[in-house]
């Protein structure tokens, strides 16, 4: 097996992985292709920490961690963090940056389904940010996340709604007009309506706790959380207690 390529595994889109492999070296460039992720990370981290009752001392899994932006920030909060991704280059970047920063994060190249088969009910918090729209079977990812969290634990998802507004803002606006992310980053057909995501959640031990929109104002060039899930949104769920 070539370690530099994503192995042939269930629920892996190699074209999607290749997109992020190509720009992995610039993952921590605050003015590069991943600038929006750096900009919204404090909002994500704050939401996750607040809804989880803090992260200190908790065992956390970040599914689709990429270059480690969220994973590192959760480790800085005192969590014991594992990051999963199928991209070899992003994980190499994540490991190097963590080493340079003196932050301890375990990074693993495997699918969430594989990880769930070996680590069921081992995490206090599971995060899956902007990953569902990049895999062939997002429903399978939701089910695996539910298997990984401890009874009473928290699982967070973020993705993009599928409608005309999200296409205009996330694809036309962000990729072609504002050039906030590389062209071809998103495929509107892979976006997920909140009702679809909630239906998959309902098939598991998870229960919806809260949903919020993530909004960008191009005039003020700022991001904020708030009502309205027309474009980007985050969902907080909790596993039933045993």
UniProtKB/Swiss-Prot annotation:
Enzyme class: transferase
Keywords: Methyltransferase, S-adenosyl-L-methionine, Transferase, Ubiquinone biosynthesis
Gene3D superfamilies in UniProt: Vaccinia Virus protein VP39 (3.40.50.150)
Entry's EC annotation: 2.1.1.222, 2.1.1.64
Residues that, per the record, bind S-adenosyl-L-methionine: 44, 64, 85, 129
Catalytic activity: a 3-demethylubiquinol + S-adenosyl-L-methionine = a ubiquinol + S-adenosyl-L-homocysteine + H(+); a 3-(all-trans-polyprenyl)benzene-1,2-diol + S-adenosyl-L-methionine = a 2-methoxy-6-(all-trans-polyprenyl)phenol + S-adenosyl-L-homocysteine + H(+)
Pfam family, one: Methyltransf_23
Associated pathway: Cofactor biosynthesis; ubiquinone biosynthesis
One Gene Ontology biological process: methylation
Gene Ontology molecular-function annotations: 2-polyprenyl-6-hydroxyphenol methylase activity; 3-demethylubiquinol 3-O-methyltransferase activity; polyprenyldihydroxybenzoate methyltransferase activity
Alphabetical list of NCBIfam families matching this protein: UbiG
Function of the protein: O-methyltransferase that catalyzes the 2 O-methylation steps in the ubiquinone biosynthetic pathway.
Family of the protein in this entry: Belongs to the methyltransferase superfamily. UbiG/COQ3 family.
Protein name: Ubiquinone biosynthesis O-methyltransferase
Species the sequence originates in: Salmonella arizonae (strain ATCC BAA-731 / CDC346-86 / RSK2980)
